[in-house]
Amino acid sequence: MKRTVIMMLDSFGVGAAKDAEAFGDTGSNTFGHIAKACAEGKANDGREGPLKLPNLAKLGLALAAKESTGSFAEGFGDDVEVIGAYGHADELSSGKDTPSGHWEMAGVPVLYEWGYFSDLKDSFPKELTDKILERAGLSGFLGNCHASGTAILEELGEEHMTSGLPIFYTSADSVFQIACHEETFGLENLYTLCQIAREELEPYNIGRVIARPFVGTGPSDFARTGNRKDYAVEPPSKTVLDKLKEAGGEVVSVGKIADIYAHCGITKKVKATGLEALFDATLEQVKQAGDRTIVFTNFVDFDSHYGHRRDIAGYARALEYFDSRLPEMLALLGEEDLLLLTADHGCDPTWQGTDHTRERVPVLAYGAGLAPGSLGRRNSFADIGQSIASYFGLEPMEYGESFVA
């Protein structure tokens, strides 16, 4: 029985990519800088001491990161018996965003430029917002700027609740984000507004519209909920997910995977919010999975809760929790199953600003007869998609080189 489990540690980069300078990210290193902060006692909020990831280390994380950067992350070495194949990958895609990373690892790199709203203030063209407001029957909106999702709630959340006007904002990514209160504005109203925005944004080549619902009574207790929804454009060609689905296989999305691929190539969608619930749901879907199935989970909290918020200790806590549960996953795998752990970009919590960082990502592979040892540097995330295609005996992808026989 052949099954693939993909655990996407959203934003868990392992060192600056070869083209990081073009993004202002030279020297970024999500894993390395978290490990350094932990070793120096600077990440002791809710945890203590050096970063402890024994199970990820067994799968080859420390060695993959060393191959990427030239040195071990602090607190890690070669004193672990490695049971998996490990490597690191550079990105071909033009951006350091979520869709680009996910699509590329499924065999479809983004070789064109996304559209962006580059102005930090008055970010959106009036022609665009006028069309959205007219179709939605709204008199105006708040925001119109680059912002951190939590900071803008503190700044504009109360005004939004009293005025009924949605909050429009963006970032360095190709995104149009809309924040609205679930109770005063209404969740379905927010989703309808996002669908309108998605349609009106088509000429602008924007990768995603993101619904950012929140609850609370004021700045002190505003909190985003798990009802986020991404409205992505479709990948420009068929991914390995599409190819497996067309060949009669199953592709199970856990968390926001289906949204990222615009629901293309997905046969089953499982909603879960938070690291614990996402891990629980992944285990349950693996238990249920039959032959020729991909179970694909995005562990978004690493990025949304800790990377963007530059919360080093929180990121470390989350990694240690994830690591503590890996034995549960390994125990479910048959000898033919293939486990893949990777990331879609970096989001170094020690870096300036609040945006993603252009980094290499780990490629950790276990099972399916793979011998423990180095996979080396992969020239594209697409090597993962090509390997999945090879594993399932599918038609080869246009991009990528397989590391699975």
UniProtKB/Swiss-Prot annotation:
Its main location: cytoplasm. The lineage of its organism: Bacteria, Pseudomonadati, Pseudomonadota, Gammaproteobacteria, Alteromonadales. Its EC number is 5.4.2.7. The gene is deoB. It is found in: Cytoplasm. Belongs to the phosphopentomutase family. Binds 2 manganese ions. Isomerase that catalyzes the conversion of deoxy-ribose 1-phosphate (dRib-1-P) and ribose 1-phosphate (Rib-1-P) to deoxy-ribose 5-phosphate (dRib-5-P) and ribose 5-phosphate (Rib-5-P), respectively. It comes from the Bacteria. This is Phosphopentomutase. It comes from Shewanella loihica (strain ATCC BAA-1088 / PV-4).
